[in-house]
Amino acid sequence: MNASVLEASYPISFQKKEAEKLGEYLRQRQCVNLIGMKRVGISNFLRFFLNHPDTIPTYINQKEKHLFIPVDLNDLVEQEIYPFWTLTLKRIVDVADQSDLSPEVKAKVNDLFVKSIQFQDLFMVIDSIRHALVLIGENGMYPTIFFLRFDRLKDKFNPSFFDNLQGLRDAANGNLAYVFTSYRSLVSIFPEARANLSVFSQTMYAKPAHESDMRIVYDAYRKRYKLTLQPPIEKALFAVIGGYMQYLQLGLIHLNEVESSTLNTEKDILETLLSDERIVLQSEELWESLHVEEQKILMQVVKSQQVDALEQERGRYLWDTGFLVGEKTLSIFSPLFEAYILHLEHDESKKKKTAHLTRKEHLLFTLLKEQLGEIVERESIVEIVWPESQEFGVSDWAIDRLVARVRLKLREQDTPYEIQTIRTRGYKLTPLKE
């Protein structure tokens, strides 16, 4: 158990249905593709699953020893194949060092990492991973690698990539399992690997959480950050967020910043959250993650228009991931997201009339201008623009979208600056060349 991880303190009943299903797959050593809408709470659930001391005996096996190895692709400085495998090997070493493996085995695993880094050869890195996983298996542990945000590699796929993943499983005699998290299925992200993926990946969808699970998360935040919300406000908050974890986190931040005593109804909560730029940006990220046909279906639902059988088939993702709920009468999972969709057209027309910078856009521009001509890294942007969200994390999409908005408005305002993207590092504001 990692005591510093908040989710490790959740009751073992947290998201029980999902934990039972994932645990059964891992008991059978099957690989899983865990799919959910962006920021729905997969990371929150997995932090619980990976760190709670009772996860393995409760949901997998009381007698077996399992080694969970999380590899978060957000930690990749470069979204390339070689850094990916190097990060994977490093995380295996990190987890092995903290495990019950003998000092001799730990030393061997560490030695594999050191040698592979010295030669900087892709084949040697993958071979070192193979040796490390075999060592772990031979010493009575079942390794499971959790590749978090695996879709970040979608542009770097090559035919041998999944062959190498399968090769590692074969070398471990089937004792190695993978869990891939993504917002779309691996088959749709890597269509060239369809044949490989069908062999070893089971599909599991993560939908917005039930209110009882949201209550667990809320209570943990409330105790850690000493939040005080009146029961009617709590009830209204749960009603408008619809089980969406990022809305809960951003909503609590917003309500902690404003005078919540003036808020009495669900309508009050909805209106104040809709005024928060962070929540609007999160809703936009959700909307932009959808295909045009899926967006059209959601627009039909909020306008109470019929969705026919063909549209339902094409928009299956909306039902699988929980964007849409209900059978006879369809509805959007969250009144907050529904309100965003209804305001889309109005917001678009409003954007065309003004090029004024919003608060976060102004923070970003000021930061870049203060370091004119210098690279400002993503971490610095998060620290200045999203200080309240550092613990929860800020997605690449949110940063890129904010930069794109400022870039567009600078052109509309005819300012003498432009924003340059520095690949894998950050952004730089430079004077326009005449």
Name what the model sees in each region.
Residues 325-326, 352-357, 399-434:
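DNA-binding patch around the recognition helix
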Residues 24, 28-154, 158-159, 242:
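P-loop NTPase nucleotide-binding core
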Residues 10-22:
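N-terminal pre-P-loop "Q-motif" helix
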Residues 234, 239-321, 356:
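Winged-helix-like regulatory helical subdomains adjacent to P-loop NTPase cores
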Residues 3-5, 141-144, 154-240, 254-258, ...:
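The catalytic "switch" region of P-loop NTPases
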Residues 294, 360-364:
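The N-cap/first-turn positions of alpha helices
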Residues 355, 364-401, 411:
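Positively charged, aromatic-enriched patches within helix-turn-helix-type DNA-binding elements
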Residues 291, 323-349, 429:
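Short capping/hinge segments at domain boundaries that bridge a core fold to an adjacent linker or tail
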